[in-house]
Amino acid sequence: MKRDFLGRTLAVIEDLSVEEQMFLYEKTRELKQRWYSGEDVSDFRIKKRNVGIYIVFVEPSTRTKESFINAAKFHSGPNVKVNVFDSEHSSFNKQESYTDTFSMLTGYSDYSIFVVRTRLEGVCRLLERRISEFASRNGIEVPSFINAGDGKHEHPTQELLDEYTFLEQNGFDNSFIHVALVGDLLHGRTVHSKVNGLKIFKNVKVDLVAPEELMMPEHYVEKMKKNGFEVRIFSSIREYLDQKDVAKIWYFTRLQLERMGEDILEKVHVLREAVTFKKEYLDALPEGVKFYHPLPRHKVYPTIPNFLDTLPLNGWETQARNGYWVRIVLLSMFGGALEAPFDTSKKEEKPEEDFIIPAPITHGSKGVQKEGKRGIKPIENGTVIDHIAKGKTPEEIYSTILKIRKILRLYDVDSADGIFRSSDGSFKGYISLPDRYLSKKEIKKLSAISPNTTVNIIKNSTVVEKYRIKLPPTIYGFEELRCKNENCITNPAHGENASPSFVRNEKGQFICEYCETPHSFEEIWSI
């Protein structure tokens, strides 16, 4: 049974299970207590030989970068070298890909831990996959990657220190938490990480306090509800304090003007007013409230104004210091210094659900002949794809037929297609492929292009096999796939030659596996 965390990646907070996160928090608590009482903490230091810790910040940062540098220096010694990567004068400026850069860096140590911050989203997930393959090819130990913030996607190590700080305030009781998230919930990646980070608490109540223009994206709100959180929404601090059930943990974020469009910037004064705390609000707060903030604060327009610095409300200073301790422990785990009392193997993927379902065959050849009478010549042998985009308009159906032909390369000379009216009055598409049998792989591809179709295998003018195809749980491996997020690492403009892949959620949306942007089925296709 694996008990170490070597080779693990933290791209999103869910890459650590709740059990693994709680282990990290308990070890952080232990480290702090032993450090401040003057006890030996050497067992937290990485002892594995020839380890390289690389701090690679392609996006500027002060707190996160310095926190990680100092956490890495805690481990620095004969066995561990700390490298602060100068991205401004690096091969990135020579248009080298992330994959090539990190492949070469991986070869300079027996084992590597990379701490990566980028404007592009999903970089650590890409590196986890690509560099694992590189390491396997070259007999190198698979490295670890830690996401130190990627665009407006996630900031999992900030989430770790936030949750640790919340636990401290709660006396390390994780039975319940009531937290208010206040500020720019649209662009703030730290609040996006809380969608899953708060799952360490058994009962969760979240109040979202932001005007509509800055409200948390709907797919994150839905995910909170799916996680069992009670979620309430308020448009301003004033509205929030007008009701009596006020949280004792407030988590503020700054307005990220650099990520906003012109339409939002025109309203910035009104938006800022809605989420900035004022002196007049103090009397409405319940006893024991603490304010937190991932920092930095805007020096002119802080959502937590400076008059609060000296009040007992100030929890953000302790929160910031906790980042050092949490990141030391995270590096201890990923560097092999700390082992868990439970299995730390990466959990197996769920088996893919069966989405190609054999269907009963009725009237063997009758159905084929029937289609022939409506304009398509019946075939003796081959494949008939039926019920294409059933219920859609003729224009949409024909577009789907063209998509199927292009992606599956169904350019057979004798093939035919058409649009017919079903017995229920709706339209459906139809492709007839004489002497051509679709392979199982092609049928799987078809399910991704046009779900809910029917595939008929015909021999001697008789339907001998029939399949009904459902929407697959994952879609990948097509050149025509595109993530609509321009900042996703898979976007062709970024030159990483990364193929998008999508996972279907319970609502039928397809979530990019790199940046977690939700898409409709139609949106994932570039044709």
Curated annotation (Swiss-Prot):
Disulfide bond sites: none
InterPro entries to which the protein is assigned, alphabetical: Asp/Orn_carbamoyltranf_P-bd, Asp/Orn_carbamoylTrfase, Asp/Orn_carbamoylTrfase_sf, Asp_carbamoyltransf, Asp_carbamoyltransf_Asp/Orn-bd, Asp_carbamoyltransf_reg_N, Asp_carbamoylTrfase_reg, Asp_carbamoyltrfase_reg_C
Molecular function, one GO term: amino acid binding
Enzyme Commission number(s) of this protein: 2.1.3.2
Location of region: Linker: 343-357
Ranges where the record places region Aspartate carbamoyltransferase: 1-342
Pathway the protein acts in: Pyrimidine metabolism; UMP biosynthesis via de novo pathway; (S)-dihydroorotate from bicarbonate: step 2/3
Keyword entries, A-Z: Metal-binding, Multifunctional enzyme, Pyrimidine biosynthesis, Transferase, Zinc
Record: residues binding Zn(2+): C483, C488, C512, C515
GO biological process: 'de novo' pyrimidine nucleobase biosynthetic process; 'de novo' UMP biosynthetic process; amino acid metabolic process
Region (Aspartate carbamoyltransferase regulatory region), start-end ranges: 368-527
Top-tier EC class: transferase
Catalytic activity: carbamoyl phosphate + L-aspartate = N-carbamoyl-L-aspartate + phosphate + H(+)
Source species, domain of life: Bacteria
Record's GO cellular component terms: aspartate carbamoyltransferase complex
Pfam families per record: OTCace, OTCace_N, PyrI, PyrI_C
Secretion signal span: none
Family as reported in the entry's similarity comment: In the N-terminal section; belongs to the aspartate/ornithine carbamoyltransferase superfamily. ATCase family.
Name listed for the protein in its UniProt record: Protein PyrBI
Gene that this polypeptide is encoded by: pyrBI
